[in-house]
Amino acid sequence: MDFTTNILLSIIVFLGIVLLLVALLLWVRNKLMPKGEVKITINDDKVLTVPTGNTLIATLAEQKVYLPSACGGKGSCGQCKCRVVEGGGTILPTEVGFFTRKQIQDHWRLGCQVKVKENLKIVVPQSILNVKEYECTVVSNRNVATFIKEFKVQLPAGEHMDFVPGSYAQIKIPKFDINYADFDKELIGEEYLPSWEKFKMFDLHCVNTEPTIRAYSMANYPAEGDVFMLTVRIATPPFKPDRSGFMNVNPGIASSYIFSLKPGDKVIMSGPYGEFHVKEHDTTEGGPSTNSGTANSQLSTLNSKLPEMIWVGGGAGMAPLRAQIMHLTRTLNVRDREMHYFYGARALNEVFYLQDFLQLEKDFPNFHFHLALDRPDPAADTQGVKYTAGFVHNVMYDTYLKDHKAPEDIEYYMCGPGPMSAAVVNMLDNLGVAPENILYDDFGGGAPKKSN
């Protein structure tokens, strides 16, 4: 038997063993994997009959019950929390870090980590049952800053969505292969094209090999109609060590997809989600009233006994803060509650919705807009735009909180980059502000950590 024949026989034997092992694994899986249908009881009320084998979050989505998920069901955001009071097995190591010991005892789980193998009884927030999925039409998708788009889509005709300002939406991201060179340059805008060309943005390429989901805060408030409006920052790859260009890794999947869309395109959105809402308060002696419980139940007048409010934002974190502020002013006409908005940006041309907030200052004596730019900006000086040079947490302290009589009594609402949020929390902690007075937009990453 010659050498070539030996090689061929070895390959045939090897492939035969591999095929036998694969067949064995499939047989074992078929025997061990439960078949048929089971029942999922939601909140001791709604009963679903579903097939086995998939994750709880995916199974519920097939039944039009949408648990939130900022990571596409990969177990990294911790947003798809629910109580699994019967069935579901024991909590997995991948879930433990998202819950306190008390929550684990109360059967809290991540929907993306629970396999549907048996009858389940689960408890979810009632608001989850009001979430709907829509096929929306892109209305506009223009750049409002160098790397940030205002992405606006219209709900289908006849559809209406009740939501509380500060909520977020989810967008389905399909498989794709996108070249940034194909982006519509008119939608980016002449003002921002030089920076895109300088950083060779149009050389980037992004591939998404499996459908996923991402979450974004809504910048719109209810009076603006049946739309989703998001502010989305493009997530570029990191720079090479020598700063000669971007590293050869995928840009952000969701932001690449959104930046590629044009008016008229169809997208799948769901919402509303989230609990980043203006706090409820007692405003009368007769009992509790609300200024944020539902879009239709908010009071048109609020009295001066309510605490002062401060919003702190940066970058695309503008979205939910704009929604809350515009709703309180333009819709509810709140004039007897002190309100301040501190917004940080690198330069004036990175600040969007500026004219809206400057006009609010004129129309509402109780509203004050504070702009913080990283460094002195000649463009802002030339245009006469009022700002303070420095990072937003320092500007907030030096120009206002340092001399405030009771900063611990203020309500703080925050959304922005992680380092900004951490710096603000650390500063407020040093001023004696209790954690319950600091609200932040969060997709499962946990509260911003104080620095040591």
Q: What feature does the model see in each segment?
A:
Residues 2-73, 84-105, 276, 298, ...:
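Reductase modules of NAD(P)H-dependent flavoproteins
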Residues 21-27, 31, 97-159, 179:
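Fe-S ferredoxin-like electron-transfer domains
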Residues 55, 79, 121, 168, ...:
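Residue-level marker of beta-strand positions
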Residues 297-300, 304:
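Intrinsic disorder
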